[in-house]
Amino acid sequence: MEKFDIIILGSGPGGYVTAIRASQLGLKTAIVEKESLGGVCLNWGCIPTKALLKSAQVFEYIKHSEEYGISVENFDKNFDNVVARSRNVAKTMSKGVNFLMKKNKIKVFKGFGKLSENKSIIISNQDGSVNTIMGEKIIIATGARSRELPALKQDGKNIIGYREAMTLKNQPKDIVIVGSGAIGIEFAYFYNSMGTKVTIVEFLDRIVPAEDVDISKELEKNLKKNGIEILTSSEVKKTEINESGNVDVLIKTSSGDTKTINTEIVLSAVGIKTNIENIGLEELGIKTEKDKILIDDFYMTNIKDYYAIGDVVKGQALAHVASAEGILCVEKIAGHDVNPLDYNNIPGCTYCSPEIASVGYTEDQAIKKGYEIKVGKFPFSASGKAQASGKNEGFVKVIFDSKYGEWLGCHMIGDGVTDMIAEAVVGRKLETTGNEILKAVHPHPTMSEAVMEAVAAAYDEVIHL
């Protein structure tokens, strides 16, 4: 029986990054993966969706080329090619992970891994054979899948999850998207840009409900302007395939009335369910709560030498969180002096148009925490770079503690803001105050100047407003 220092179940951004760091630390490492290397993120999530969204963005630019003084005639999208490009990008990235496994001398086992006694893993291989490996430490990073609701039973054809939404053979004429988190909003933007009639149904009273209220309002305004119908405080009560092969979606609306929408496709984007069934948790006595594995600050479960990271534990279900958790976990195992992860300094991004990026407290959260706050906001309509780019929607909003100047939160909506949020993450990590941001010279003309200007607005020193 082959033995390893570290065995990792799952090769998503939690699993494969952890494996590489473990190898760098001199630990003999193995990964068990039942599907493609890279997990959901590389194959069915973060990466292929961004490829789809880039195609949508290019198509939008061509549609509005006259605004830039350029005439384009007889253009159209090829939906099959858009999907094919996305799949090719995913395959390329998965091959890249395979290369990294070989480079770092990490052994990859292709099959379904189940925890067994004495820190062993029983692997049901793709060829039907079974073998067993042992590890000194075992890290569970099996990720999650699309969650189903009773009224939204997915059939893979008419009522679908995010996987099917990425690989539809034909572009639907209309689609109802249930849920307005990152997944729902990104697909809403993509399909709307492609020419599909989109309706968003959100149970809570605003879209992207985890974001600052001002962000939700700005995004809703932009989506409606582009023809997307939005039903907030609404709930899907029933779905039924009708005689024409479409779906009748019965919705209880905010007024308390019901309405039925006839649509080709329903996309369920109501969250995720962890992949922790049938992997041996119960047999070993590993504790779970509400679909999550219970862990300490350094990701060890209640059973010694068993760890869990990523979507299977409490916290934000984000790729970069899983990677950070995995690195911290394995460094702790290797004997390094590490500090627990600061979950209040995790950035979140939504890649619609305009993009959304945020970190830290929203304004409401800061007030509820008891802070006296300074708030600054700078609109991209006052940004030279945004005006020159023809993308002047949105703003940057910053929140500071009035007493000590702590940077409590930063919230952005606009073109390219997902590439700007790192300034706030680094600033908050280094305990930067607003005064230090103001003294840091920002290049002109850039979108990132809006961060400095928003901070200036919080301190009543804004120049370009």
Predicted regions and their residues:
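Hydrophobic/small residue at the entry helix of a nucleotide-binding pocket
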Residues: 14, 38, 183
